[in-house]
Structures are given as C-alpha cells and as structure tokens.
Amino acid sequence: MASQSQGIQQLLQAEKRAAEKVADARKRKARRLKQAKEEAQMEVEQYRREREHEFQSKQQAAMGSQGNLSAEVEQATRHQVQGMQSSQQRNRERVLAQLLGMVCDVRPQVHPNYRISA
C-alpha cells in the first residue's frame, strides 16, 4: 500500500512537472509570436517610411519642374501683356483719328449694283 501511495505521488509529481513544462512552452510560444508580430510590424513601418520617402522625392521632383514651368509661363505672359499695353499706347491716337475719320467723313455713293429703273 505504501509503494502504491508512493507510485501515485510520483505520478502526480510527474504530471505536475509535465503541466509546468507545457505551460512554459505555451509562454515561450506566446513570447515568440509576440516578438515575431512586433518585428513584422517594424518591417512594415520601415517599408512604409521608405515608400513614403520615395513618393515625396518623386513628387518634389515633379512639382519642382512644374513650378519652374509655371514661373516661365507667368513671366512670358507678363512680357506679352506689357508689349500689348505699349502697342496700345503708341497706336491709340492714330487709331482713334482713323476711326473718327471713317465715321464722320461720310461720302454718299450709289451702290454699283443699284439699277435705276425708269
């Protein structure tokens, strides 16, 4: 009976040690999963930062050249407007005199296609 009781005690202790080993293994597995998840998250963040930096540099390059083009177009437009204004100032009096002459100096004439029928 004592040997049977001692055998039961050994089995209980062995079962307890096995349960502890299983619990430790589960804890290690949970730690490994957590660590792997953190590493994967860090890799994703690093990749995202690299792609964002790449995008920003490409966008800056595209917008920078576009900004130069818009400045050139604006400067050309200003130059053309100034040319038109100076041309208008130079020719204003002559055009007004010509226009007034055409309106005020009326010379009545019979149209060449008009047929006098009598």
From Swiss-Prot:
Positions with biased composition (Basic and acidic residues): 35-56
Start-end of Polar residues biased regions: 57-69, 78-89
Compartments in which it is found: Melanosome; Cytoplasmic vesicle, Clathrin-coated vesicle membrane
Transport in keyword set: yes
Coiled coil: none
Pfam families with a match to the protein in the record: V-ATPase_G
Residue ranges, annotated region (Disordered): 25-90
Alphabetical keyword list: Cytoplasmic vesicle, Hydrogen ion transport, Ion transport, Membrane, Transport
Main location: other
GO BP, one annotated term: synaptic vesicle lumen acidification
GO (cellular component) term, any one: vacuolar proton-transporting V-type ATPase, V1 domain
Membrane topology annotation: Peripheral membrane protein
One GO MF term attached to the UniProt entry: ATP hydrolysis activity
Domain of life per record: Eukaryota
Family, as annotated: Belongs to the V-ATPase G subunit family.
Assembly, per entry: V-ATPase is a heteromultimeric enzyme made up of two complexes: the ATP-hydrolytic V1 complex and the proton translocation V0 complex. The V1 complex consists of three catalytic AB heterodimers that form a heterohexamer, three peripheral stalks each consisting of EG heterodimers, one central rotor including subunits D and F, and the regulatory subunits C and H. The proton translocation complex V0 consists of the proton transport subunit a, a ring of proteolipid subunits c9c'', rotary subunit d, subunits e and f, and the accessory subunits ATP6AP1/Ac45 and ATP6AP2/PRR.
PANTHER family xref list: V-TYPE PROTON ATPASE SUBUNIT G 2 (PTHR12713:SF13), VACUOLAR ATP SYNTHASE SUBUNIT G (PTHR12713)
Role summary: Subunit of the V1 complex of vacuolar(H+)-ATPase (V-ATPase), a multisubunit enzyme composed of a peripheral complex (V1) that hydrolyzes ATP and a membrane integral complex (V0) that translocates protons. V-ATPase is responsible for acidifying and maintaining the pH of intracellular compartments and in some cell types, is targeted to the plasma membrane, where it is responsible for acidifying the extracellular environment.
Name recorded for this polypeptide: V-type proton ATPase subunit G 2
Native organism: Pan troglodytes (Chimpanzee)
Gene, per the UniProt record: ATP6V1G2
